Regions:
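Positively charged n-region of N-terminal signal peptides that target proteins for export
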Residues: 1-3
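Hydrophobic h-region of N-terminal signal peptides that target proteins for export
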Residues: 5-15
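Glycan-processing catalytic domains of CAZymes
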Residues: 15-375, 380-408
């Protein structure tokens, strides 16, 4: 080895190995949720918590206590709340009686976040859902309705509105949901399609216009022609969402469905852990480490370089960053780096930024040039959540990964 490498190896060898498990972030602060039906078996719920999830998904009333005992949260799913023909609701007294029964059965269980209503509804169904969620809010204040939206690229006919903005805003204005939730699966052929960033850009804008936080439901299994999960696919989906100011991550799906070519969810069709489970845990623990800082930040801009997806903005418009260089070692020929920068400020007006490597296959060494001279970067550690001086070998990004900085 060369002398400089020997010195670095010696310095690393001299450091004691320290392991830190970040404090768990509550689901009401930043949900990390398995999308789908929650299990009844305590051992499966225990595995969910060990994987870094804080919400088990959609549980039956009878399982809510098991979810609580496992240290998780959930949305209750019950046909007395969500089993209606939304084009022909029964009389209101009948709905009120049904909802009251479910609310009484749930009681004061702190694990229950609210009630699952429907996934990807047509806009014509939302007014009826709004009538039911209005009764829910009256009888169970503080409980949230849960509806997840289509991705923006579906047709107007499937959404039932002339544009995606109108569709998404109905979730807030008609159903009264206190968060936006949507999905957009775009991992194909070793790349993230631009649809993913298009949707983030649109939802971030609507989130700011309606003053409503947003949750992203990301791909966590392989099916159809989507890629198989990896550290890189989880990193890019999660860190891009964080860079856009997202306030929740959901995984479709934690359990591998028993049909088609679905495979490599965190738990397979026989109830066993797959390699995906470990990758999921690794990224979830990073979310727990960063969430206490992220939830205090307000998103002020997101910028892409060198390619700028539709609806998105170029790095030249950044207020904080003049430029970024991304380099590779020993790679011939070197690959052009692709990245995005999310910018934020905290309650004291202090600036933050997050850089995300958009490449799913390559690591890069990076250097950030700030617009204001004399400023320096303080790294928020992805593993402890603590601030630390930016130096040593911190200037490398793994495929899909991101780093949060405070600008001092």
């Amino acid at each position: 080895m060369r002398p400089c490498i020997l010195l670095l190896a010696g310095a690393l060898a001299a450091q004691p190995q320290m392991f830190h498990s970040p404090e768990r972030t509550p689901a009401r602060t930043f949900p990390i949720m398995a999308w789908g039906g929650a299990p009844s078996q305590p051992e499966q719920l225990k595995l969910m918590r060990e994987a870094g999830l804080n919400a088990a998904g959609f549980c039956r009333v009878d399982d809510a206590d098991k979810v609580r005992d496992a240290g998780l949260s959930c949305f209750v799913t019950d046909r007395r709340v969500n089993g209606y023909d939304w084009s022909h609701l029964p009389p209101e007294p009948e709905i009120r009686k049904n909802v009251a029964e479910v609310v009484k059965a749930v009681g004061e269980n702190p694990a229950v976040l609210g009630f699952y209503m429907r996934d990807e509804p047509h806009a014509s169904l939302m007014p009826a859902m709004g009538r039911v969620t209005g009764i829910l809010k009256e009888l169970a204040p503080g409980m949230w309705p849960y509806v997840n939206l289509f991705p923006y690229r579906v047709s107007k006919e499937r959404m039932g509105t002339p544009d995606y903005d109108t569709y998404a805003k109905m979730l807030v204005d008609t159903i009264g949901q206190p968060f936006l939730s949507y999905d957009n699966y775009s991992l194909v052929g070793g790349e993230m399609l631009e649809y993913f960033y298009n949707n983030l850009e649109i939802v971030r804008r609507i989130s700011q216009e309606t003053k409503t936080p947003f949750w992203n439901c990301v791909l966590a299994n392989a099916h159809f022609n989507y890629m198989e999960p990896s550290d890189a696919t989880f990193h890019l989906q999660v860190y891009a969402t964080l860079a856009y100011g997202g306030r929740g991550i959901q995984y479709f799906t934690y359990y591998s469905p028993h049909n088609g070519n679905y495979r490599l969810g965190a738990i397979d069709q026989f109830g066993n852990k797959t390699a995906t489970w470990d990758a999921l845990r690794r990224v979830n623990l990073q979310i727990h480490a960063l969430a206490p800082t992220m939830v205090k930040l307000r998103s002020t801009g997101v910028y892409h370089y060198p390619d700028v997806p539709e609806y998105c903005r170029p790095l030249a418009q950044s207020k904080l960053v003049r430029g970024v260089s991304m380099l590779q070692r020993y790679v011939r020929p070197p690959v052009q780096g692709r990245f995005l920068i999310g910018e934020f400020e905290d309650g004291q007006g202090r600036p933050y930024l997050m850089i995300v490597n958009k490449d799913l296959n390559n690591s890069f060494q990076f250097a950030i040039e700030l617009r204001q001279e004399g400023r320096k970067l303080i790294r928020i550690c992805n593993y402890s959540g603590q601030e630390e001086e930016f130096g040593r070998e911190m200037d490398w990004l793994a495929p899909g990964a991101g780093i949060l900085f405070r600008i001092q």
